Amino acid sequence: MARSVWKGPFVDGYLIKKVQKLMESGKSEMIKTWSRRSTILPIFVGFTFSVHNGNKFIPVSVNEEMVGRKLGEFSPTRTFHGHGADKKVKRK
């Protein structure tokens, strides 16, 4: 079920503060975050976030098409190593 419109998008408060500080200073640093649940806002466009995937930080550079989605959608948590080989074929 989607979030109610009257509640608005969820973003951790410290994330907005970090973006505003970088906007004032004019620097283009990576913003390190564990907040995969935060929604991407229009003020985030052009910034690069390091989003934690449980093991390491994945760099995510935000563009206009990402607005409204979550930061965690762009740093996958699982790696696919392929299906196991068919053991019946190897025996022959």
UniProtKB/Swiss-Prot annotation:
Gene3D superfamilies, sorted: 30s Ribosomal Protein S19, Chain A
Listed GO biological process terms: ribosomal small subunit assembly; translation
One term under GO cellular component: small ribosomal subunit
GO MF term set: rRNA binding; structural constituent of ribosome
Keywords: Ribonucleoprotein, Ribosomal protein, RNA-binding, rRNA-binding
InterPro entries per the UniProt record, alphabetical: Ribosomal_uS19, Ribosomal_uS19_bac-type, Ribosomal_uS19_CS, Ribosomal_uS19_SF
Origin: domain of life: Bacteria
Keyword Lipid metabolism: no
Signal sequence extent: none
One Pfam family cited in the UniProt record for this chain: Ribosomal_S19
Known function: Protein S19 forms a complex with S13 that binds strongly to the 16S ribosomal RNA.
PANTHER family: RIBOSOMAL PROTEIN S19P FAMILY MEMBER, SMALL RIBOSOMAL SUBUNIT PROTEIN US19M
NCBIfam families on file: rpsS_bact
Similarity comment: family membership: Belongs to the universal ribosomal protein uS19 family.
Name of this chain's protein: Small ribosomal subunit protein uS19
UniProt source species: Rickettsia bellii (strain OSU 85-389)
Gene that encodes the chain: rpsS
